[in-house]
Design a protein with these regions (language model features):
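N-terminally biased helix-coil "hinge/interface" segments that flank
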Residues: 1-405
């Protein structure tokens, strides 16, 4: 029987296939236009290595697990959904933070003009002080829709002790906008994501979840259907950032945030134990982000209130650290002729110059090929041919000449 583990990043998708103690690895390019394509490509390449058909392999697969850093990359590159946010009256500028300055990073995901307030109040014990009015909710909703919101996040004060007003918002919106609700417009409640105290952290959590939702969830069900259509009898299991896996139906977008690096920490801990190492640093270099993990005395650590690219949230995660520098990061010269690398990444398309998919700007991968750090005869199955190597060298030479100007 087979086990299949696949990780999709912003540039490459990697597969680990095992059968009866034998394992093989695969690397293919991520397909940002449709992530189910690179998932299928990875499975096809894995089947080839075992000299079986895709259907025969999937029919004999006990478990297929999937992890991704797409959520991380979406936040780093600020390419998520346009969302609207509804908060309690008086908290539009602070988002419940003690110091309004703490809320500034959140406005990069949901600008102030996409935030609306409703007049309601629930005290710290869950008692309703001011009742939420229907007209107030629908007026806010309509304004946000008119502003182009593709998803609505609702985070009201003290909803962790009494979510009644948040649930009322969702019910009113569903009744008033059934086509939006069931179709292109989604409604997320902070109380459904977290029941932990801390209105600011819950607000950040629901904003991040709504922001990265479309980049992930829209294709997870399609991926599972594609696998089933090829005789896979078991559900697709999606990796979560706390270290476990769950079915697609039980997965929220924020659960997948940094799930690839998180499971990498668990895997590194297992290898460390096998070789007698109890203190391990893990390094996961992707195409858009670099992620670090730490194992001390054989134990990986959890953060119950982690920070996601500067946003304190209230969902448990294995502790990892992300930086916007990786193999696809683009090098450039600033106004003072200083070398800068990242955070912009070439991704899988147009990709680094050496991929010959339209990329024209030098990346870390191009530099690695020129320096001999990456073997073009091995990387990506040898698809970096001599012509592509020459292109990378010419681009790096041209770029380096800028230092002499």
């Amino acid at each position: 029987m087979f086990t299949i583990d696949i990780d999709t990043g912003g540039t490459c998708t990697d597969g680990f296939f095992s059968r009866d103690g034998e394992f093989k690895t695969v690397k293919v390019l991520t397909t940002p236009h449709d992530l189910t394509v690179c998932l299928a490509d990875c499975v096809k390449e894995g089947a080839k290595l075992f000299d079986v058909s895709v259907r025969d392999m999937l029919a004999a697969t006990d478990v297929i697990r999937y992890s991704t850093t797409i959520g991380v990359n979406t936040l780093i590159t600020k390419t998520g959904s346009k969302i609207g946010l509804i908060v309690s009256k008086g908290f539009k500028d602070s988002l419940y933070a003690d110091d309004p300055k703490e809320a500034e990073p959140v406005f990069s995901l949901v600008p102030k003009e996409m935030i609306d307030e409703v007049h309601e109040d629930i005290d710290d014990r869950g008692n309703i002080i001011t009742t939420l009015e229907k007209e107030d909710v629908l007026d806010s909703m309509q304004r946000l829709i008119d502003m182009g919101a593709r998803a609505i996040a609702v985070s009201l004060r003290n909803s962790h002790v009494n979510p009644a007003h948040e649930r009322k918002c969702k019910s009113l919106i569903k009744d008033q906008y059934p086509n939006y609700y069931l179709g292109s417009l989604r409604v997320f409640l902070a109380s459904e994501i977290s029941d932990q105290p801390g209105d600011f952290q819950r607000t950040n959590t629901i904003v991040v979840n709504g922001y990265i939702h479309d980049a992930l969830v829209k294709y997870l069900y399609k991926a599972e259907d594609d696998l089933r259509n090829n005789f896979c009898a078991h559900p697709l299991m999606v990796a979560h950032s706390y270290g476990g896996v769950a079915r697609v139906a039980k997965t929220r977008a924020i659960d997948t945030y940094s799930s690839g690096p998180a499971l990498g920490v668990i895997g590194a801990g297992t290898l460390g134990e096998m070789y007698g190492f109890s203190n391990v640093i893990t390094v996961d270099i992707g195409g858009t982000s670099l992620d670090l993990g730490l194992i001390r005395d054989g134990v990986h650590h959890y953060d119950m209130n982690p920070s996601i690219t500067g946003f304190p949230v209230s969902v448990p995660m294995i502790t990892t650290y992300s930086a916007p520098i990786a193999s696809g990061s683009i090098a450039r010269l600033d106004g003072s002729n200083n070398l800068k690398v990242g955070p912009k990444s070439a991704g899988a398309r147009p990709g680094p110059v050496c991929f010959n998919l339209g990329g024209m700007e030098p990346t870390v991968t191009d530099a690695d090929v020129v320096l001999g750090i990456i073997d073009p005869d091995y990387f990506l199955g040898g698809r970096i041919n001599k012509d592509r190597l020459t292109m990378a060298i010419d681009t790096i030479d041209s770029f380096a000449g800028g230092f002499e100007d």
